[in-house]
Amino acid sequence: MAETSLLEAGASAASTAAALENLQVEASCSVCLEYLKEPVIIECGHNFCKACITRWWEDLERDFPCPVCRKTSRYRSLRPNRQLGSMVEIAKQLQTVKRKIRDESLCSQHHEPLSLFCYEDQEAVCLICAISHTHRAHTVVPMDDATQEYKEKLQKCLEPLEQKLQEITCCKASEERKPGELKRLVESRRQQILKEFEELHRRLDEEQQTLLSRLEEEEQDILQRLRENAAHLGDRRRDLAHLAAEVEGKCLQSGFEMLKDVKSTLEKCEKVKTMEVTSVSIELEKNFSHFPRQYFALRKILKQLIADVTLDPETAHPNLVLSEDRKSVKFVETRLRDLPDTPQRFTFYPCVLATEGFTSGRHYWEVEVGDKTHWAVGVCRDSVSRKGELTPLPETGYWRVRLWNGDKYAATTTPFTPLHIKVKPKRVGIFLDYEAGTLSFYNVTDRSHIYTFTDTFTEKLWPLFYPGIRAGRKNAAPLTIRPPTDWE
């Protein structure tokens, strides 16, 4: 059976070769015996190269014979055969392929076409190899059969591959859309956060005004009671002064005069012993113990955002002295030592930066300013000029709140924004929301909002501390970074 298949395969290969030979003959010119060039068909139906048949009939004026069948035609009739021209090109290509296949598909041992396939050795073999001792016991089939079988197997593999390719293509397209979707989600969340904090600020401001109004009402109530009690005590004081004068006068009288109404005087003195002298308490009964619980939650949120800020001596102006724990800074008129002029160090503006800057997120820290009369706190961007004279404004990379002359507060915008602060802050809270582009300042002393800068931050931001120049004993105190105080 195997030998029959091999013989059939050999016959099939021979038949294919014969068909190719016939195609080459049909595509050849009978005059030049080469492939037809610009094939034309004459009246008898035979085809020739246009140039060949033209030369063949060159000296004739009538009765033009066919070079093949010798049939003559009265006229020089040459009709282009474009379809045959296409077949000629195909024949040329097939000849090239045949030559290539012949060169590549010959058995290296027997120089016969590799027309069969051995399953066991997974290799192409020729007819002689197939009946040899090496492959006689193997399963050998015609190359076309093996090709068809493996083609079907490959096609079965192709479907899941195409499905997986489609899945990956869809997934990739989905992933490529996600940055835009993420941007929209982030912007939506950003607007939500801004809206929530705006509402929170509004409610805090309202609550602040309510509490301050209640505090003022309580102050007026206590002042009224103090005035009334002072008037009452004034009346008692006058009564007692009159009684004391009366007693002194009695003591100077003669016996008859003294005894005349001494009992009445003694009764008055006795009543004085039981007279109650009361004072008005100025203790504030209405305090922050009733502060709404939702704002304690805000404080808890801020606690989670507390930044561990320490001062960087490499940035400190030479006239600034830092504490050992790098939490405090103060100005000294005489430099204690010469410091290297590094690129990070400020040489004109007497300030110092923190050791850590921020390029994202939300961060909160507090600075104790005490009774100082001159200071500034805030942030600056990484690229600010640190040498020579400068103007610390948002346009130059500085966002600050400052105090000078003991009572003048301002946000250092262009121009300065005066800040009307009712209660002098002993401690200032600073809240940076990098993505939202906000930097907020709070008076920790009375828990009020001072000012908020709104900008677009594109660089690393560094916490900045300016203790002010030493102008009097009060401003000699340092600026100190403190852990945030509790509101609870």
From Swiss-Prot:
Annotated region (Interaction with CDKN1A), positions in chain: 268-307, 359-488
Record bears the keyword DNA damage: no
CDD domains hit by this protein: Bbox2_TRIM39-like (cd19780), RING-HC_TRIM7-like_C-IV (cd16594), SPRY_PRY_TRIM39 (cd13745)
Alphabetical UniProt keywords: Apoptosis, Coiled coil, Cytoplasm, Metal-binding, Mitochondrion, Nucleus, Transferase, Ubl conjugation, Ubl conjugation pathway, Zinc, Zinc-finger
Domain of life: Eukaryota
InterPro entries noted in UniProt: B30.2/SPRY, B30.2/SPRY_sf, Butyrophylin_SPRY, ConA-like_dom_sf, PRY, PRY/SPRY_TRIM39, SPRY_dom, TRIM/RBCC
Zinc finger (B box-type): 102-143
GO biological process: apoptotic process; innate immune response; mitotic G2 DNA damage checkpoint signaling; negative regulation of canonical NF-kappaB signal transduction; negative regulation of proteasomal ubiquitin-dependent protein catabolic process; negative regulation of ubiquitin-dependent protein catabolic process; positive regulation of apoptotic signaling pathway; protein stabilization
Subunit description: Interacts with MOAP1. Interacts with CDKN1A.
Family: Belongs to the TRIM/RBCC family.
Name listed for the protein in its UniProt record: E3 ubiquitin-protein ligase TRIM39
